[in-house]
Structures are given as structure tokens and as C-alpha cells.
Design a protein with these regions (language model features):
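Transmembrane helix-loop-helix hairpins at membrane boundaries of multipass inner-membrane proteins
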Residues: 1-8, 13-97, 106-107, 455-460
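Structural signature of hydrophobic alpha-helical transmembrane segments
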Residues: 1-10, 73-85, 124-135, 187-201, ...
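Alpha-helical multi-pass transmembrane bundles of energy-transducing inner-membrane proteins
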Residues: 21-27, 106-193, 201-205, 274-337
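Short aromatic-rich membrane-water interface segments that cap or initiate transmembrane helices
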Residues: 62-80, 188-192, 379-385, 465
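Short helix-boundary/re-entrant hairpin motifs in multi-pass inner-membrane proteins
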Residues: 63, 195-262, 285
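Helix-loop-helix module between adjacent transmembrane segments
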Residues: 67-127, 144-148, 152, 232-235, ...
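Predominantly late transmembrane helices and immediately cytosolic-facing juxtamembrane segments
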Residues: 213, 312-336, 349, 384-424
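Cytoplasmic/organellar membrane-interface segments at the starts of transmembrane helices
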Residues: 345-347, 401-465
Length: 465
């Protein structure tokens, strides 16, 4: 037995098995959540390259697997990343108890997560782009909605992610040439440019993020939210792995500034778009772009702990996005998404606002401690980027205030006729949203509980200095 087979091969296998029993959705849901949780627990307690059991009946889990001449490697130091991915997925799947329309996410999510995990393990790095492309293509049936009249967002999703593949492949090739010819700086410049182009398409660097809000509008918010966040987090970790492996690229003149400029404009543009766009259903896409920009800005900082700040931003992002997308799924039952939402679904409406303000770094909420630390570092190292980030966050807070005013305003008479098409959210959802608000406050009030976990997540990237 080896680690890549456990955390990459088995999820794909079980995802296919669960897809075959789609006629039994309740069994599919329970078994699927159990599998997500099991893989997360194995990432915590199952040691790699350490003997298990007695000397007579023990065994060792190997860290590598060779397939077609390519090596998949997973070390003990990388297990916290797997815990984050599988734990986040298990937490997300809990919301499917109230979202039967999105239950197909269980089998597809396992297959996609297995492939994305494999992309983090494969060596050489350049083959990760091909595995991500396979995950993107497998997600097409998940995102395709037969009831939707438009599929422009899905088409752009495929096009933009596919365009990233050749640039990423060429970036890996150029980086290997640069290592073999360190005296030739042209190879280093080519590798940096190609890598920037590839990740710009994948992360939605301004202005290449137009497909994200379109995809969020066309598909179920709980499905698109999961896929966008999972893809973004894995791609960010791939970028960190690339910079950790090729240290000369991380310290190359102009790379930190490029990360700051790209990240700053992502935060600013996403905040402004969220502020002016009146369609609440598109909000998770803008928040995804904004959080990706904050991650790039964190990676550009100098000092001993940019990676810790990077991972500290991820934890509240994943938690609050899950609650936000679930709340939007509840509000989507109404003929009019926003107006009168407080009267019809008060817990879901409050959860939407708490999520928005948390990701904007509002005091006492989950996103505040890491956001405060990021703004403090930017004030010391990059005041111009600080201005871009601050303007984007202010615009996002303005969007939250505008949505709040719309939610408390009574709907028009014609809208009231369809207000009771769906019953009010049940007790389980109300408890779930209440727990989410409490979790948000606990993370904001006691950030010291999060920092050790953030340090563990990035312990695999030891070359980062």
C-alpha cells in the first residue's frame, strides 16, 4: 500500500462506485460523507514511511508510486494539506442534507478531489496541468444544468482552464532548462512569464475572471461554489509548490511586485464588481476572485511567515464560503432572491451578510485576524498595494450594506404572490446557520487557535525563505 493510492486512487474509485448507486440518494449521501471524513481522518492519523503494527504483522505505507514512468510522491509533511482539502469537502457535503438537487456533487466531488490531490503529488510538476484539465472535463456533467437556457459560463470555464494547460506545461519545461543553464537568464524570464500566464487563466487574474460570475449564475450555487473554491485552493498550493521547488524564481527581481500588483487589482476589481452587481447569486464568484488576490498578495510579502499568513487566510475563507453558498441555495428557492429575505428566511439572510462582512475583514468576525495581519504587513512593505486592497475591501463592505438594505425591504405585491412557493428553512438549517455564526465569532475572537493549524498546513514547503 502507498500514500498516493490511498488519497488519490481510492477517492476516484469510490466516486465511480457512488455514481453507480445514484438511484439510492440517501445511501449515496451518507456513505459519501463518511468517505470524505474517513480520508480526512486518515490524513491526520495514518503515518507515511513509518511502520504500523508489530514487527511480525506490520507494514509500511510508501510515499511514492510510479505510473507510466511518472512518479507520484506524498510525504508525511504534506498530510495537513490533504486534511484541509478532505476536511473542507466533508464539511461542505454536510449541507447536502437540505440540498437534494445538488446531491450529484457527492460522487463527482470524490473523483475531482482525487484528481486534484494527484496533481499535487505528480513529479515532474508540469504534468499537474494535465491532471487538472482532466478534473475540469469531468466536472462538466456536474455543472451542466439541462434546465438552464444559457451555458456561456460553462463554455468559458472550459476554454479558460484549457488555455492555461499549454502555458503551465511550457513553464515547467522552461524552469527545468533554467535550472540546467543557470547562467542564461533568458530561460528564467521565459519560465516566469509562462507561469504567470498559466496561473492567470486558472486563478482569474484581472481581467480573466468573467467566466466565474457567469458560471455561478448558471449553475446551482452549492455546486459551483464548491468547485470554484476547491480548484482555486489546489491551484494556489500548486503555485506555492512551484515557487518552493524553484527558489530562484521566488527571489527573481520583479516577481514579488508582480504578485502584489496582480493580487491588488484582483481584490480591487472583485470588490468593485461585487459592489455594483445587483445579482446576489454571483457573489461567491467575486469573493473567490478577491480571496485569490489576497492569497497572491500574502505570498509576495517578505519575512519569515508569508506562508503562514497565506494558510491563515484559507481557513476562514473555506468555512465562510460553505455557509454562504448554502444560504444562497436556500434563498434561491424564492422567486426574488433578495427582497424580503429577512422575513422569509431570517437565518439564511443573516448568514449571507455575516459571510460577506467576514471575508471583508470586519472586526470580530472570522476573517478579521488574518486580514489585520495582512494589512499591517502591507503598510510596512507595499503602501500602494495596501491602497488597492483597502479600496476593494471597502467596496465589498458597501456591497454587504446594499444587500442588507435590499433584504430588509419588503417585496412588491407581485413578488409576494410567489413568496411561499417553498416552505421556510427547517430546524436543521437554522441550527446549522446558528452554528456557523458562532464559529465565525469564535475564530474572530480567538485567532490563536487557528495559527498552529495554519503553520502545520504549510510545513511541507521547507525551502521557502
Amino acid at each position: 500500500m502507498n500514500a498516493p493510492l490511498i488519497w488519490a486512487g481510492l477517492p476516484v474509485f469510490f466516486g465511480v462506485v457512488l455514481w453507480l448507486i445514484k438511484k439510492y440518494p440517501r445511501i449515496q449521501l451518507l456513505v459519501g460523507i463518511g468517505l470524505y471524513a474517513l480520508f480526512a481522518l486518515l490524513a491526520i492519523f495514518l503515518p507515511i514511511e513509518n511502520p504500523l503494527g508489530t514487527q511480525q504483522a506490520g507494514f509500511i505505507i510508501d510515499s511514492s508510486l510510479n505510473i507510466l514512468g511518472r512518479q507520484f510522491v506524498l510525504t508525511f509533511a504534506e498530510q495537513p494539506v490533504l486534511m484541509l482539502l478532505f476536511g473542507f469537502s466533508a464539511f461542505w457535503m454536510l449541507g447536502l442534507f437540505s440540498q437534494s438537487h445538488a446531491i450529484r456533487l457527492i460522487p463527482y466531488g470524490l473523483v475531482i478531489l482525487g484528481l486534484l490531490t494527484a496533481s499535487l503529488m505528480v513529479q515532474p510538476f508540469l504534468y499537474a496541468a494535465l491532471i487538472i484539465e482532466a478534473a475540469v472535463l469531468i466536472s462538466v456533467p456536474l455543472l451542466a444544468d439541462p434546465a438552464s437556457r444559457s451555458s456561456r459560463g460553462l463554455v468559458r470555464f472550459i476554454i479558460f482552464l484549457s488555455l492555461a494547460v499549454p502555458f503551465t506545461l511550457l513553464a515547467g519545461w522552461a524552469a527545468n532548462l533554467a535550472e540546467a543553464n543557470p547562467a542564461n537568464g533568458m530561460f528564467q524570464i521565459r519560465a516566469a512569464i509562462l507561469l504567470a500566464l498559466g496561473f492567470s487563466f486558472m486563478l482569474g487574474v484581472f481581467p480573466l475572471f468573467t467566466w466565474m460570475p457567469m458560471l455561478s449564475e448558471e449553475t446551482h450555487p452549492y455546486v459551483s461554489g464548491f468547485l470554484l473554491n476547491l480548484l482555486s485552493v489546489v491551484i494556489l498550493f500548486l503555485g506555492v509548490r512551484f515557487l518552493n521547488t524553484y527558489g530562484w524564481l521566488r527571489t527573481m527581481a520583479g516577481v514579488p511586485n508582480a504578485l502584489q500588483i496582480a493580487g491588488g487589482f484582483m481584490v480591487l476589481s472583485a470588490g468593485l464588481w461585487a459592489g455594483f452587481d445587483r445579482k446576489l447569486i454571483r457573489l461567491p464568484a467575486y469573493l473567490n476572485v478577491l480571496q485569490n488576490g489576497l492569497a497572491l498578495v500574502a505570498l509576495s510579502l517578505r519575512g519569515d511567515s508569508p506562508l503562514v499568513l497565506f494558510s491563515a487566510l484559507l481557513i476562514p475563507r473555506l468555512v465562510m464560503t460553505a455557509y454562504l453558498c448554502l444560504a444562497l441555495s436556500v434563498l434561491a428557492h424564492r422567486p426574488v432572491l433578495e427582497k424580503g429575505a429577512f422575513a422569509a428566511y431570517p437565518f439564511a439572510a443573516v448568514m449571507v451578510l455575516v459571510s460577506i462582512f467576514s471575508m471583508a475583514g470586519f472586526p470580530l468576525l472570522a476573517g478579521f485576524p488574518s486580514m489585520l495581519l495582512l494589512l499591517e504587513r502591507l503598510g510596512q512593505q507595499a503602501p500602494a498595494t495596501l491602497a488597492l486592497v483597502a479600496l476593494g475591501l471597502i467596496a465589498l463592505i458597501g456591497a454587504g450594506i446594499r444587500h442588507m438594505i435590499s433584504m430588509v425591504s419588503p417585496p412588491a405585491d407581485l413578488e409576494m404572490q410567489g413568496l411561499a412557493v417553498e416552505p421556510a428553512s427547517g430546524l436543521l438549517l437554522n441550527v446549522y446557520f446558528t452554528a456557523g455564526i458562532l464559529v465565525c465569532l469564535i475564530i474572530g475572537l480567538f485567532p490563536s487557535r487557528i495559527m498552529p493549524a495554519a503553520e502545520e498546513i504549510v510545513r511541507a514547503f521547507q525551502n521557502w525563505r
